[in-house]
Amino acid sequence: MNPLLQDYARILLEWNQTHNLSGAKNLSELEPQITDALKPLEFIKDFKSCLDIGSGAGLPAIPLALEKPEVKFILLEPRIKRAAFLNYLKSVLPLKNIEIIKKRLEDYQNLLQVDLITSRAVASSSFLIEKSQRFLKDKGYFLFYKGEQLKDEIACKDTECFMHQKRVYFYKSKESLC
């Protein structure tokens, strides 16, 4: 793991002791989650902008932003302590490419258009698509980090679902929604 990702992990574990941001209690539990956040970089198309919904403890947005400093990330996180954590990360790590918005997806009224929309452990895929597609460029993609329950949430083709260990990555273009 690169040093910046190690710094992120260390800070998250420190904050986690008092703020309960993640279920991970140590680096050996957190490291696979960071690897999981970065895995889609192996198969997704290049992107210049990303909206992360329900950023929480920063997964997947912070590892992605650290690995892709040229990409603009907008992190939507409505909970105060989690937004404070994300703002702290921005102040101590080289994360000039992120903007933290303390709002729920349903309350976010910006006209922004992004290349990629990500989310991990927030809501059903169909809900996320319905509420967020207006922020996605016509040639953009959704990337949702899901578990085996994905097939119960939404119909998807094998070409839209990528598996790694127990994770299912749902990767679907906006164009294919029609």
Swiss-Prot record:
It catalyses: guanosine(527) in 16S rRNA + S-adenosyl-L-methionine = N(7)-methylguanosine(527) in 16S rRNA + S-adenosyl-L-homocysteine. Its main location: cytoplasm. CDD domains: AdoMet_MTases (cd02440). InterPro entries: rRNA_ssu_MeTfrase_G, SAM-dependent_MTases_sf. It is an enzyme of class 2 (transferase). Its EC number is 2.1.1.170. S-adenosyl-L-methionine binds at G54, L59, L105, E106, R120. It is found in: Cytoplasm. GO terms for molecular function: rRNA (guanine-N7-)-methyltransferase activity. The keyword S-adenosyl-L-methionine applies. Keywords: Cytoplasm, Methyltransferase, rRNA processing, S-adenosyl-L-methionine, Transferase. GO terms for cellular component: cytosol. It comes from the Bacteria. Specifically methylates the N7 position of guanine in position 527 of 16S rRNA. Belongs to the methyltransferase superfamily. RNA methyltransferase RsmG family. This is Ribosomal RNA small subunit methyltransferase G.
